[in-house]
Amino acid sequence: MAKLIAFDQDAREGILRGVDALANAVKVTLGPRGRNVVLDKAFGGPLVTNDGVTIARDIDLEDPFENLGAQLVKSVAVKTNDIAGDGTTTATLLAQALIAEGLRNVAAGANPMELNKGISAAAEKTLEELKARATEVSDTKEIANVATVSSRDEVVGEIVAAAMEKVGKDGVVTVEESQSIETALEVTEGISFDKGYLSPYFINDNDTQQAVLDNPAVLLVRNKISSLPDFLPLLEKVVESNRPLLIIAEDVEGEPLQTLVVNSIRKTIKVVAVKSPYFGDRRKAFMDDLAIVTKATVVDPEVGINLNEAGEEVFGTARRITVSKDETIIVDGAGSAEDVEARRGQIRREIANTDSTWDREKAEERLAKLSGGIAVIRVGAATETEVNDRKLRVEDAINAARAAAQEGVIAGGGSALVQIAETLKAYAEEFEGDQKVGVRALATALGKPAYWIASNAGLDGSVVVARTAALPNGEGFNAATLEYGNLINDGVIDPVKVTHSAVVNATSVARMVLTTEASVVEKPAEEAADAHAGHHHH
């Protein structure tokens, strides 16, 4: 492939245009009075959403130099979403503002390396300030506030808070579509563990990047599955019965894995393979727990059950299983409540009888997994477009609520960042030259989220930012009521974890862009295609 190369100012300007294109599409959604964006989907109706990361994921630009910029900022949104699950719009905006500020200074002759030192120091300072301003979140009402701000929907806020209360702040909360138009919460028996799919080809729900299996056959295998002849007879039985299949084994490798991937791509069978979690005896014990939850029999040569002889009697099942990149959630396993309770009793006895603290901790962890239960929020709405939009909001709300419970909250509406920016301006005096410019660049960028929240509400952003800067910690502008006041009491709050990861990811990408001296892209394909056509004139 031929490449195109741009240097210096050209390279950076192309990147900036791409950054702006993506960020401008995302920033209209910011704040309680933010607007929606409509995404055209190849399948099904268009998606109307105000979820920053969903919009960002959908954007690819035609101009390859601009697309580099768009993809860089997209990575900020996606990364922030992975870590904190929310705050993607804020992260995107911060990155855009920092890149624009920084490039302006580079064009005016500032040294990018020195600028970066300033930005790094300012980012460190910002994170310290965020920690210092954090308030702990304890009661359900505060959690409901966080979830409400995130989803802009009080009903969702209350349901998410109720779910967190039932399963604890580390408990599993999943989102499903409801059959009715009501959104409701139910707590079901379920178990989850931190291992995801062995291959991304198993994903069957592209929106959530998960593999979702309804009423699947569950195959638990003690050892590795590495021989195809041993494994094929059982696989064929599943294909015949037309059921989805979840395989949990020490590992699935070589030909068996290839076979599963190929069949998954061809849609011959809905299948997901997952490595069993933990090691040694812990792995063994946990597999036995799973067997009881799903009513499966573990395929284990030690007890005389070989893979090549096993039939459908070894399968367990569950109502629904979702597998993401690093987590598997089994909801409503087929195991009877009595069996599961008996298993819990057995683990409780183990806890009582052991002298080792480590063993006790691990057994308690298993007990918690077995008794935790899983909260399922069933999302209902009148149309499919609305259901999809609401599902995204509920997922954001769950992530925000969990982040708040873990690391506390700060005043929302971008106000805490505006006030931290004031601290940075004073902090900048400790620096010289271009490093000072770098610290100030971040201070300017930190004002942008509040600016756009006010702008989207139809007010003059700069006036709001200037007034907010003078207010004490915890106070700021409430765009929902259009008044200034104590945001923490009004429930306008953001999880520290979300804002923290937004700042970290935005500054890291901005620093990369500022030090870019050349960009290399593939030459667009149309021209190449025409060139080939020229060879056929005999």
Swiss-Prot record:
Sites where the protein binds ATP: 29-32, 86-90, 413, 478-480, 494
Location(s), subcellular: Cytoplasm
Predominant location: cytoplasm
Record keywords: ATP-binding, Chaperone, Cytoplasm, Isomerase, Nucleotide-binding
GO annotation, cellular component aspect: cytoplasm
InterPro entries assigned: Chaperonin_Cpn60_CS, Cpn60/GroEL, Cpn60/GroEL/TCP-1, GroEL-like_apical_dom_sf, GROEL-like_equatorial_sf, TCP-1-like_intermed_sf
Top-rank taxon, per record: Bacteria
EC class: isomerase
GO MF terms, alphabetically ordered: ATP binding; ATP-dependent protein folding chaperone; isomerase activity; unfolded protein binding
SUPFAM superfamilies the UniProt entry points to: GroEL apical domain-like, GroEL equatorial domain-like
A Pfam family per the record: Cpn60_TCP1
Enzyme Commission identifier(s): 5.6.1.7
GO biological process, one term: protein refolding
Record-linked HAMAP family: CH60
Function: Together with its co-chaperonin GroES, plays an essential role in assisting protein folding. The GroEL-GroES system forms a nano-cage that allows encapsulation of the non-native substrate proteins and provides a physical environment optimized to promote and accelerate protein folding.
Family according to the record: Belongs to the chaperonin (HSP60) family.
Subunit-level organization: Forms a cylinder of 14 subunits composed of two heptameric rings stacked back-to-back. Interacts with the co-chaperonin GroES.
Protein name in the entry: Chaperonin GroEL 1
Protein source organism: Corynebacterium glutamicum (strain ATCC 13032 / DSM 20300 / JCM 1318 / BCRC 11384 / CCUG 27702 / LMG 3730 / NBRC 12168 / NCIMB 10025 / NRRL B-2784 / 534)
Gene: groEL1
